[in-house]
A protein has these predicted regions:
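Hydrophobic alpha-helical transmembrane segments of multi-pass membrane proteins
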Residues: 35-39, 66-67, 94-102
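Juxtamembrane/disordered regions of integral membrane proteins
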Residues: 7-10, 14, 21, 28, ...
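Alpha-helical transmembrane segments and their cytosolic interface
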Residues: 91-134
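Short helix-perturbing small/polar motifs within transmembrane alpha-helices
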Residues: 10, 18, 38-74
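Interfacial aromatic-anchored transmembrane helix boundaries in multi-pass membrane proteins
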Residues: 21-50, 61, 83-88
Length: 134
């Protein structure tokens, strides 16, 4: 939710810094593998967020949230494939894709509750949030 908030309400640079800080936190608290997988997932989800915002039409917050969650899990799968083997990483794909759908849906529901209140307190610095309907 934090990176999605930064992409929508701040700017892409802030979102990138958050991805890097989250990966650094994972590295320091859970080790090199967790830091690497966090970076892979965060980078791919940020890239997907940016691509979705570049579309010439408005998309729903649900699609935005679920796409980010699925991209995050796919990024982690790619990172795991690079560290382990493709076959080992692929065995986790169905579980992570289902988890991405569930977590993305939950993220959407929480965002739908939080973002309108945040908009009233802190006006968006980015026009990106106008491309997503929550």
């Amino acid at each position: 939710i934090v990176v999605m908030y930064a992409v929508l309400f701040l700017n892409r640079r802030s979102a990138l810094y958050l991805v890097l800080l989250k990966a650094l936190f994972a590295l320091l608290t859970r080790g090199v593998t967790a830091g690497f997988l966090s970076l892979c997932g965060g980078a791919l989800s940020l890239a997907v967020f940016c691509l979705l915002l570049a579309l010439p039409f408005t998309i729903t917050g649900y699609i935005f949230s679920v796409s980010g969650a699925l991209a995050h899990n796919c990024g982690q799968l790619l990172g795991a494939a690079a560290l382990l083997s493709d076959k080992m990483a692929i065995t986790y794909a169905p579980i992570l894709l289902i988890a991405g759908l569930i977590v993305g849906s939950c993220t959407y529901m929480v965002s739908r509750l939080i973002f309108p209140a945040v908009k009233r307190i802190i006006p968006p610095k980015s026009k990106a949030e106008s491309k997503i309907t929550f």
